[in-house]
Regions:
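Short, low-complexity, intrinsically disordered N-terminal peptides in bacterial proteins
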Residues: 1-2, 122
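Surface-exposed patches in mature extracellular/periplasmic domains of secreted proteins
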Residues: 13, 31-36
Length: 122
């Protein structure tokens, strides 16, 4: 994966989920998500992706240690829950925020988010 290709991009209203879909579409395989692009909220988008990943219809399993191309699900706290995501690659997490895509060390991610889950294709 050429990380700089993704760092040069900006994504729409729900940038993190759109980045994950873009990376999987480009680098791996599409992750079909039953979600319409009209009136999407962060919670609805998160729900759709979590269902696509957690139901394992696409062969995803939760793993303890990250591997390249693992989807990283993130949450600020248990109360808030999972609401952000990225892609693990070479010790860092590629994730998108409104207006910018960043590639941060996993240690920085762990300092920022209380909840960190890794999901990989089985």
């Amino acid at each position: 994966m050429i990380v700089n290709d993704y760092l040069a991009k900006t994504y729409g209203p729900q940038p993190c989920w759109e980045l994950v879909a873009d990376v999987y579409q480009t680098e791996r395989f599409a992750v079909p998500v039953d979600y319409k692009t009209v009136n999407r909220s962060i919670r609805e988008m998160s729900s759709a992706f979590r269902l696509a990943i957690h139901k394992s219809a696409h062969g995803f399993v939760q793993i303890d240690a990250p591997v390249n191309f693992a989807i990283v699900l993130l949450g600020k706290s248990e109360r808030v829950g999972i609401h952000h995501c990225g892609i693990y690659f070479d010790g860092r997490v590629l994730h998108a925020l409104p207006g910018i895509t960043v590639y941060e060390e996993l240690s920085v991610i762990r300092d920022t988010f209380e909840l960190v889950e890794f999901w990989a294709k089985a």
